[in-house]
Amino acid sequence: MNKPKNSPVRKIIAENRKARFNFEILDTLEAGLVLTGTEVKSLRANQSNIAESYASFENGEFWLINSYIPEYTQGNRFNHEPRRLRKLLISKREMSRLFNSVSRDGMTVVPLKLYFNDRGRAKLELALARGKKTHDKRETEKKRDWNREKARLMRDKG
């Protein structure tokens, strides 16, 4: 049986789950990555980590900093450096909007997911976010616990 044509197929490689806890997500966007061949092969083997990474604006371009893509095991002397800077491919309009938000409002750009889209291209889901304070994190956790408790009560009653 064939898949429906309109459903996007995303093979998620890495997810930054702590970002939703540590930051208040205000807006998301999709960005491409400039990768080498061994990086793509390593990603296809589901090996990467974006938990400690962030995006920064330098020399008129956005760069992904501190992302980890391990060396490809079958790679030879042309293998890549695991923690190198990776250029993000974003439209100029998005880039200027992100730059203005980051420089003026004290926000940051954090990666949420790294995945292959339906055409096999590596994409990064970025979020424009504001850091949460400790009391905000506690409040979010209380709301989440209360929602779970409500769902449990409704399930047990009904």
Curated annotation (Swiss-Prot):
GO terms for molecular function: RNA binding. InterPro entries: SmpB, SsrA-bd_prot, SsrA-bd_prot_CS. Residues 132-158 are annotated as: Disordered. Pfam families: SmpB. GO terms for cellular component: cytosol. Required for rescue of stalled ribosomes mediated by trans-translation. Binds to transfer-messenger RNA (tmRNA), required for stable association of tmRNA with ribosomes. tmRNA and SmpB together mimic tRNA shape, replacing the anticodon stem-loop with SmpB. tmRNA is encoded by the ssrA gene; the 2 termini fold to resemble tRNA(Ala) and it encodes a 'tag peptide', a short internal open reading frame. During trans-translation Ala-aminoacylated tmRNA acts like a tRNA, entering the A-site of stalled ribosomes, displacing the stalled mRNA. Belongs to the SmpB family. This is SsrA-binding protein.
